[in-house]
Amino acid sequence: MPVGSVKTLTLGSHGDTMVPVPSASSVDGKPLTEVLSEAEIEPLVTRTRNGGGEVVALLKTGSAYYAPSAAAARMARAVAEDTGQVMPVCAWVDGEYGIAGVYLGVEAEIGAGGVKKIVERDLTESELAGLREAAGAVRAKQADVASL
């Protein structure tokens, strides 16, 4: 299957509390949940959370910098050209998804000046719970740093 026919979304933080969003994913324009069963999706969610380590292991030297570099280039273009493109970014969350006071990976409209607005999706209960768990993990890390 061509990579370009698969569209996915991941929110939250990086690592164990990463939140792959199957409800916002598609294959050839069809919702992922219509293409694969829950039993087929769950291992993909787990592999996505652990994917950074897999990429680093395959590269043997260096790190998993290709995707972040491509994303940074897309963001820079969106800011420079004031496109208003919606993309996943790390942004200050202030009430969206019932979460406030933390930087978190969410979808946002990007243009001149950076984040214009956070775009909230309708998440499933488990996706929303995962996003809230990610926010808690980020807050805990912030508290660790603040205590230094």
Where are these regions (language model features)?
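C-terminal substrate-binding/catalytic lobe of Rossmann-fold NAD(P)-dependent dehydrogenases
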Residues: 1-148
